């Protein structure tokens, strides 16, 4: 199955003993089991050390000439206040020496849209900031929304392509995330290799009989 929502992936995997999926590390909960990858368990420590290998950036896409209100929210996200919220939500802050938030006192509506992986932490940021409306979709939609002006800020849980950047937006990394490979809690598998992940997702392996225990 192709699922565009983190919640759907969690529901599918928690309800099927043979299912496998991948989600944002920050969205991991006790309804599923995260596998070790190459013997390394996903954790804040192993992500920061580089021992856990499946990592990705959380980016936002914004246009030049951002409204004062939207710029203030971006400033909040990148401040020590915003970065602390990101860390408390289970993600890796990108600036441990960020300055404290200083408001520009702007007012106005701020629309943020995009990645379902980024949405949970963006909602926490918006709740603390109290002025942003977060709309969940997917990375590509969020970037398109930023390009065409439907949103002030697009959320992406991937690198923003050169083609997308050429359409008048810039990429700002707000956090680092790991991708947790998840299985049903009743699955006996505890560890998986990168080659095994590739084989499963390319369809060359379709059973658990020869996977790591």
Label every PLM stretch briefly:
Residues 1-213:
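Exported/periplasmic ABC-transporter solute-binding proteins
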